[in-house]
Amino acid sequence: MKAQGMLGALALALAACGGGGGTGGGPPPPVSLPSVDTAPVPAADPGSALPANWQYGGILEIYVRGYQDSDGDGVGDLAGVTQRLDYVRDLGVSAIWLMPITQSQDHDHGYAVSNYREVETQYGSLADLDTLVAQAHARGLGIILDYVMNHSAQTHPAFVNSSNAASNAFRDWYVWSSAHPTGWSIYGGDPWRSASTGWYFAPFSATMPDFNLRNAPTVAWHKDNLRFWLNRGVDGFRFDAVGNLFENGPGAWEAQPENYALMGDVRALVGGYANRYMVCEAPADPLGFGAGAACASAFAFGHHTDVVNAAKGQTGAVAALATYFAAVPASMATMVSNHDSFAGARLWDQLGGDVARYKLAAATYLLQPGVPFIYYGEEIGMSGAASLSGDAALRTPMSWTANPANAGFSSATPFRALSANAATNNVATEQGDPNALLNFYRSMLALRRAHASLARGSMDGASASGAVLSYRRTLGAEQTLVIVNYGSASAAASLSGLTANASYLAQWPSGVGDVTASGSGDASVVAPAQTVLVFLRAP
């Protein structure tokens, strides 16, 4: 029997055995419950329009609500993102990660999903998404979607059904207890929430109940949802909160063995489509989830703080950067900040607006191994909003122009306050300035695109000496040499392990001399203060 039919029968049964009748003595009317779209979705791979290993070119994270408003309602939308695709292409990234675009209860960040197969009404329609995907592919850009498997919205039809009675067809889709479990504390609070039919598990918020992923029909439904989007041509997913998928007790609610197994299963599904990519968010165990048996790519939490601290000149962080990729997969997703305040403020605010150090941070993660993720506006040095705090301060309208009313984001009043530095740090102002952050990001991404060793090569000979980091990137016959001086004074980098007698031709910045290795593969290079140098071994 289909789930909707089961629910209808259950509602009638509850009404018949009912209780609480009115003065007329007749049975109460049947409970009206929303339907749940559980239609199976078979795989129908449309193929891939992208080159192999496309993700290593870099991915721009976009908060759709805050990127570009196309229809004058003060809220960003999918059509607005489509309008800005030429800008994204010219930035030099290879793909876009869209923060949640599905219908949600929160109508803001989108992580309280109320419909997994429909687009948020303010963002547009499925047709708008199809247009965005097609236009992105025409420009060589991929599109990955945010997917929330851990929890749904409280208003999701499955949870409305699940919470209707202590026994129903969707009860096991969520985590329930008849009595209030004790001894639990997650994120400083009790994760169990009271409802009329019991207690449900919702550590993030009462409005975001956790799915019961031990329930096979729930997992099968999620897989159908993934195929729904993959069949439309999206190029992969970013999976939210994968460390929270299963709980085995008050002291065992994060990064449980079942989490890794399920994500490995999901990876197999995504990998069944040509040339797709997935990345997972798991701050508690990035390396575990980044392993091939699980997600095969995860955000490198911890590394991102080393990048920022190295840019500040902290030598301990410089040393950590020299060793990180010796022990982790090259598929780890690197970043300096994102949409969550727990990952840090906007990079501009973390570095106090120091442009030289900002460029060092950018060069560090854009030239090292990994899949680099750039948070929208990072490339122009957007700050947070002075009038806001927490996550909202990080999710402001994109600063396209210096217009004090809307920063070029909308013809109407924007849904949220602008970034504090929108008047100075905006695309229009920086476009024509060769020294601006925007053009520095373009240059670093162009280097990564021009030299495959910088995108996908090994990282060898990494050495940290005080505030100077040096390493080689090698892929096949191509080898690049990178030297970064995070210090406030020029310093010599003593290099070894180079190809004997080889010439290393300067690629960045202009005006730097070439380097020639000795017969034993050694060289010494003086790096100016707060500078990145890039060389390419001559063929």
What are these regions (language model features)?
Residues 153-163, 279-312, 383-392:
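Substrate-binding cleft/loops of secretory-pathway carbohydrate-active enzymes
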Residues 518-539:
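C-terminal beta-strand-rich structural cap/linker in extracellular carbohydrate-active enzymes
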